[in-house]
Amino acid sequence: MRLRKVKDALVRVQDSPYFSNPEQLSTIESESLFVEIGCGKSWFLSQQAQQNPKCFFVGIEREPTIVLKAINKVNRLEVKPRNLLITCLDANQLTEYLKPQSISKIFINFPDPWPKKRHTLRRLTAPHFLKQFHQLLKKQGLIEFKTDNDQLFEFTLEVLQKTVAHFKIIEQTTDLHNSPLTSTNIMTEYEQRFVSLGVKIKKLTLEKLN
């Protein structure tokens, strides 16, 4: 379904306590900074924030209209988190606004698989993205990656084989909801839909090396 863009979406959220301009991200002080790249409408992010009040969560979304929808959704929560911000930013720009070794964990949930070969570099698990994430993560920082797409999952495994100096796989499953990992899993809205259709969810957890 094509997204209906909202005019002046970012203007509407400028005064929200849950919105951050990218330039403000480097001022966040937290021993446990968690970042979700492509936070969508913020269900997963807000659940994480509520369940982990001692951590700080930042949602990255490049489409202003989705940023607006995400913040509106947080505003409708009965219990509103105080440890959450959402910003409008492309994943390629993360290293411009976040300090090196400042992030404890990165979540990549159901990213666009970009199936065409000419779009390989747009995949969030492409080598240049993993290199950026390695730079941003603290020592032994983590990446949690979930997808319903078999091809993207296999692509990611192939990339990791070629970049073994950067990350090691500490959790891996091709059927998350029939694995022990489901006990601590928080589902995204996409994930709920996929599971209801019987789609198997793939997951990797990566730990930073060096």
Curated annotation (Swiss-Prot):
Enzyme Commission (EC) number: 2.1.1.33
Enzyme class: transferase
Family (UniProt): Belongs to the class I-like SAM-binding methyltransferase superfamily. TrmB family.
GO CC list: tRNA methyltransferase complex
NCBIfam families on file: PRK00121.2-2, tRNA (guanosine(46)-N7)-methyltransferase TrmB
Gene3D superfamilies in the record: Vaccinia Virus protein VP39
Species per Swiss-Prot/TrEMBL record: Mycoplasma pneumoniae (strain ATCC 29342 / M129 / Subtype 1)
UniProt keyword annotations, A-Z: Methyltransferase, S-adenosyl-L-methionine, Transferase, tRNA processing
Record's protein name: tRNA (guanine-N(7)-)-methyltransferase
Catalytic residues (UniProt): 112
